[in-house]
Design a protein with these regions (language model features):
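Start-transfer (signal-anchor) and selected internal transmembrane alpha helices
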Residues: 1-42, 130, 224-231
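Extracytosolic helix-loop segments that constitute the early lumenal/periplasmic catalytic or substrate-binding loops
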Residues: 47-77, 84, 171
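Juxtamembrane segments of multi-pass membrane glycosylation machinery
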Residues: 74-105
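Transmembrane-helix motifs of polytopic, lipid-linked glycan transferases
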Residues: 99-125, 166
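Multi-pass, polyprenyl lipid-linked donor-dependent membrane glycosyltransferases
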Residues: 104-107, 139, 143-171, 185-196
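Transmembrane-helix signature of polytopic, membrane-embedded enzymes
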Residues: 116-142, 162, 175-178
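Membrane-interface transmembrane helices that cradle and orient dolichyl/undecaprenyl
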Residues: 164-178, 210-211
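Perimembrane helix-loop-helix junctions
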Residues: 195-232
Length: 235
């Protein structure tokens, strides 16, 4: 009884590795045509510039960058996009890695594919089928355009996609705190992700009811209200 779960877990790791290798192979082909290699710096790097400005003690960028979409207030120039990706890049910029956006975009893309696979496995989809549909959702869709490119518009969309999948997965697993925290991070990348909240709450409600079928909504709130703390901190 103890051997089978271990074997299943190890098999899942192998399947996830296969999935990541497939995604990487498709990316490699795309990069040969686009030149968007993950070790290259990006011209449209608003989040890197924002992280650098924060480390220098400024909220504004210090000067104009005519090729970027910036907000102007009191003759100061600000990044006009939600800031969550800048928080992700901050520790890397701190150590001097000012081209980290490309590698972060690649890692986030792989993570999105992995969580697509994990969601499918939650519903007891056979592993090969789960890999196929995870690939179909990612490299088999227009997601590929945004995922293999780390420009400011695309990396935010890429992060929002992955974080939303993570929020869905943890909602299905009845881990409310993680689910809502990742959802809040997704909103910090793309504000329209807020529209997913009703669907997420429905998944959370169903997952809780599976474990506690007698609980009403007010009971769930009383038992799980502390799960709102991470989301509130992020917001």
């Amino acid at each position: 009884s103890t051997v089978k779960p271990l074997k299943t877990k190890n098999t899942d790791y192998i399947n996830i590795l296969v999935l990541c290798l497939c995604v990487t192979a498709v990316f490699f082909v795309a990069w040969t045509f686009t030149g968007q290699w993950p070790w290259k710096s990006q011209p449209y790097n608003s989040y890197i510039l924002q992280a650098q400005s924060w480390l220098e003690g400024r909220l504004d960028l210090g000067r104009d960058y005519p090729y970027l979409e910036l907000a102007i207030f009191n003759n100061k120039y600000y990044v006009s996009f939600p800031p969550f990706p800048s928080y992700v890049m901050l520790p890397f910029v701190l150590i001097g890695w000012n081209s980290c956006d490309s590698m972060i975009a690649f890692a986030v893309s792989l993570l999105g594919a992995v969580y697509a696979f994990k969601i499918l496995k939650h519903f007891d989809i056979e592993s090969k089928t789960a890999i196929f549909f995870a690939l179909l959702l990612t490299v088999g869709s227009n997601w590929l355009m945004t995922a293999q490119n780390a420009w400011v518009w695309f990396i935010a969309q890429n992060m929002a996609f992955t974080l939303s999948l993570m929020a869905i997965y943890y909602a299905l697993k009845n881990k409310i705190g993680l689910s809502l925290a990742f959802w809040a991070c997704a909103v910090g990348c793309r504000p329209f992700q807020i529209l997913y909240l009703p669907a997420l709450l429905y998944l959370i409600y169903n997952a809780h009811k599976t474990v506690n079928p007698e609980d009403k909504i007010i009971d769930i709130i009383k038992k799980r209200y502390l799960a709102l703390v991470p989301m509130a901190v992020i917001a």
